[in-house]
Amino acid sequence: MARLAGVDLPREKRLEVALTYIYGVGKTRAHKTLAETGISPDVRVKDLSDAELVQLRDYIEVNYKVEGDLRREVAADIRRKVEIGSYEGIRHRRGLPVRGQRTKTNARTRKGPKRTVAGKKKAGR
């Protein structure tokens, strides 16, 4: 099984798709990586030679921040925003949407399940 950046790539998939299993590598970056290294995007992971695998591993290590390093950097950025008390940091701390989305309705993913609030009693007739 091919391992790149600490991730087992699925053997049966095309290389261009398999590279997107690495955190920090999407479609565009996978396509660019294969173009730069001269490896066909249509080749299956199981058909890769060891030389091509080493070439890919070296290219990704040198040019991109992926997996653990990228996750640490993102977490540090969020932690920094929370510590300095910026608007984004406050939104992170409160578990609300950070990028200006509406919260009167929707935003259930960030806010969690609805909490029912006791309403006013109906007036008796």
Curated annotation (Swiss-Prot):
Ranges for region Disordered: 93-125
Record's keyword annotation contains RNA-binding: yes
InterPro entries named in the record: Rbsml_uS13_C, Ribosomal_uS13, Ribosomal_uS13-like_H2TH, Ribosomal_uS13_bac-type, Ribosomal_uS13_CS
Membrane spanning stretches: none
GO cellular component: cytosol; small ribosomal subunit
Pfam family name, one: Ribosomal_S13
UniProt-listed GO biological process terms: translation
GO terms of molecular function: rRNA binding; structural constituent of ribosome; tRNA binding
PROSITE patterns listed in its UniProt record: RIBOSOMAL_S13_1, RIBOSOMAL_S13_2
Family of this protein: Belongs to the universal ribosomal protein uS13 family.
PANTHER family: 30S RIBOSOMAL PROTEIN S13/40S RIBOSOMAL PROTEIN S18 (PTHR10871), SMALL RIBOSOMAL SUBUNIT PROTEIN US13M (PTHR10871:SF1)
Protein name per UniProt: Small ribosomal subunit protein uS13
Organism from which the protein derives: Renibacterium salmoninarum (strain ATCC 33209 / DSM 20767 / JCM 11484 / NBRC 15589 / NCIMB 2235)
